[in-house]
């Protein structure tokens, strides 16, 4: 379940006119803080039934976190909801272990050993070698301590190297976060997507106009999960992790073939991707056994010397999908990482992207034009984006196309002063077009950028940054 407040309100805290995740797009059908509301209602009715939270809302609020809506540090959602556990991240491994344990007769309070879960306890007697985080009482009043705590959490998001973490809530005991579950193998990914999903909304919703958000993804293929891009404003590190997990070509071809039998399918696959469309393998071989590096990103500020830059598997997959009978066109809409494309010396992918997979406009996310702001964002310098545009234009000329790159920009990110905002505005003006949208920075729980926004500190050192706003 996504954050309900995010679908109810803009970042300016104004009511949205439409909720794309509700029947007919109608606003107001779901309560704010739905995880807390629904969990407490269940607890009132089923007092002894185990309640396990899952999904991105619970995952990002699993420990003490800054809440933009109330402008303060909130408890772990586990305390406010009255639930017993959180299965954080994507959850397949942990939810199966939880179900098996409960089915065997174990009480829910005994389930302290499952990777990818968060639970509460009175003391630390059953927690092996935990990292003791600053207490909730400390982080809610001291911004530097909050930044220190978040830095520790950020460094413990890898299943191969993370340790349990304990956060004290005084007389209420401790919230314990176990290390993340191991990433799914390709076989496991295929098994997940081979399940008999109806891919339809409940019939009762159809009468109310359906769920608008479903139309956007109905004929799209999820080919991967996880992202080693490392953007500071993105919550994926906390939710899906940095290790790439992919589906096999066979799995994706089978799903695409099923799509062609849908009466509503018009021959167009809208997307083949995931968090980043063109990531199809771990960033380096080390990740498969050692996990990701601490205090070091794969692409920022420049690509790591150990980075494997290779689009050949993705190119092969797209070629196979294009050949499926009944498929007229395969588009890529979930976002191409332009610095990864620039780093690839083999330009086959870029050429075929332009020739076959762009629906007139390619959406890319440079986010800003100020290198100082881009540094705070964890994004490559503006010169890398300019280089991508040159290569993209050249590929269009080579293929006889005239397609445009539509940039997505973000305003108000921590570190962006009026000077940088004017620089971005002038750049957009000089482009000669009005962008469809500019995302105002949204302080989502559990991101580095949100920590900067709240504390004014630059991680990992937690030194106060004079030029952060």
Model-derived features: positions:
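Glycine-rich beta-alpha loop elements in corrinoid/cobalamin-binding modules
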Residues: 1, 5-170, 454-455
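Single conserved hydrophobic/aromatic residue that forms the stacking wall/gate
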Residues: 4, 460-469
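Conserved, mostly hydrophobic/aromatic
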Residues: 84, 252, 364, 438
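Radical SAM enzyme core and accessory elements
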Residues: 140-181, 188, 194, 201-205, ...
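N-terminal pre-triad scaffold of radical SAM enzymes
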Residues: 208-235, 268, 442
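Conserved alpha-helical substructure of the radical SAM core
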Residues: 240-265
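Conserved SAM/AdoMet-binding glycine-rich loop
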Residues: 258-406, 410-414
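Catalytic cores of alpha/beta
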Residues: 415-428
